[in-house]
Amino acid sequence: MFVSDILGHKGNRVVAVTPEETLASAIATLSARRIGAVLVLDSDKKLVGILSERDILHAVARRAADALGLRVAEVMTTPVVTCDPDDTVEHVMELMTNGRFRHLPVVRRASLLGVVSIGDVVKWRLDETRQEAEVLRQYIAT
């Protein structure tokens, strides 16, 4: 299975903020959308960073309430690790596990195509495992 399969199922909608927005504004977006990370896009819609709950936590740990006034650019993770739609789900799982992150933007030739989360990957893998188990059950039954 490939990243393109996940995007084909879940869609390619991306939630993004700008580098100039405040951390408070980005937190409001995360909360309203009930998500754990937002992509950071510049005025040309180019991916320049990713802002995760962990990034926010580290900023608040360092600056307390003052962190809320920081610009997203001061807190975001950059450079961004990305994946390609032709990458396998197994490869993406390995990237996420080794990098200790839960969201990967999907990019091809500098064009942002979507984002996959660890939840998307785990769900896809569980569904795949269930399908394999059903095929084996049917094979054994015949």
Can you say where each PLM-predicted feature lies in the sequence?
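C-terminal structural segments of small proteins and small subunits
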Residues: R102-L104, L112-L113, G119-T129
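Bateman/CBS regulatory modules and CBS-like beta-alpha motifs in cytosolic regions of diverse proteins
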Residues: M1-T29, I35, V40-S43, L47-V48, ...
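Structured interaction and signal-relay segments at domain junctions
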Residues: R54-A64
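Residue-level recognition of oxygen-bearing side chains
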Residues: T22, I56, T88, S117, ...
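Juxtadomain coupling helices with adjacent low-complexity linkers
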Residues: V122-T142
